[in-house]
Amino acid sequence: MAIECSGRAGRTGGPGGPGAPGPDGPPPARVVPLLALACGSSVATVYFAQPLLVTLGERFALDPALVGVIVTLTQLGYAAGLLLLVPLGDLLDRRRLVTGQLGLLALALLGVGLAPGAAALLVALAAVGLLAVVAQTMVATAAALTPPARRGRAVGTVTGGIVTGILLARAASGVLADLAGWRAVYLVSAAFTAVLALLLRRALPAVMRSEGPGGAPSERPGGSGGSYARWVASTVTLFAREPLLRIRGTLALLVFAAFSTLWTGVARPLSDPPWSLSSTAIGAFGLAGAAGALAAGVAGRWNDRGLARRTTGVGLAVLVLSWLPIGLTGRSLWALAAGAVLLDFAVQAVHVTNQTVIHAVRPEAGSRIIGGYMVFYSAGSALGALGSSLAHAAGGWPMVTALGAAFSLAALLLWAATLRTAPPVG
């Protein structure tokens, strides 16, 4: 997607005048690392609740069969934000958008930390999910601030912040909860997010906006009326017209349903006898996500060699097999750790491949395509979270394992069905 400067930005510099950061000059050294930190912190808020589900369910007297709604509402909020808020990054001044959303995210986190009852908790968590999509806007901001020759490194740094945030979220949540109670997790995050908003307000220049659908400069809402609605609708239109986008989106839905089935459901068997683990220990299992970071690099290299379809097949086969050791959680924590490593490796391999393949369909619409794709991701995460709780209530951990394996097998069968399509779908 082409980027152009708004206001007075030109070839001599960014919006601040000659020598200011912009597409033709590197941003200040502190900006990209600060964006990476803010991205990781924002995305982490979506995953804080996973090791705390048992505690939250008891504290707010939630039915065990519905405790997964805590994660489900957060993910549904995130999906709504991807569709409704992320497109604003191509219409409004990103500095104001990023810092404003971070400020509102801090208030939503404060609402979670101070929630007096279940209804207030669930509303605040949905707001957290809605506003956490600011991470996607910050990725686009990093790209817009960096010249093409250095853009890949900048985006890679910021995306690395997202992976790190996901990786550390569960562990940090568990440690803080054990040290100071579950509310401290959200109150500390609220304060940290507010500080990041202030720092970015000072560090970011008035940044760029993108071209609108069809290549014309994007309009500001209210400029000619209805531009925001048309921009959102254009994302839906892209997926309606391109079969590959729908197939890869469905794969994302199934893969992340399996992912969420594990990480939402695993708190229950780990907190119950014979393990009776603390929140810290439960959160530490999230560190198995380090395998996901490794998988992202491997999958990227395979995709560059034209092996996207094979990478997808291998990843989905590993995903199915990962549920064999996961099913032995009641007997061995080592089995769970091994299964979690395999699952996270497989999920990230498929996820990176999906994004590589779909971006190539319409590179000029890359932001809208990735945003639309991430809606499938969030819907799958919400489905897995709710399904995991219902499955555990119905048949315990064996039923949760069966559900996760079913999502994984469905994804593998969908991929196998595409092998006969012409032209190939990635």
Kindly give the residue locations of the regions a language model identified.
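Helix-to-loop junctions at the C-terminal end of transmembrane segments
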Residues: 81-93, 295-308, 392
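Helix-loop-helix hairpin linking two adjacent transmembrane segments in secondary transporters
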Residues: 156-202
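Conserved MFS/SLC helix-loop-helix module at the cytosolic interface between two early adjacent transmembrane helices
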Residues: 80-118
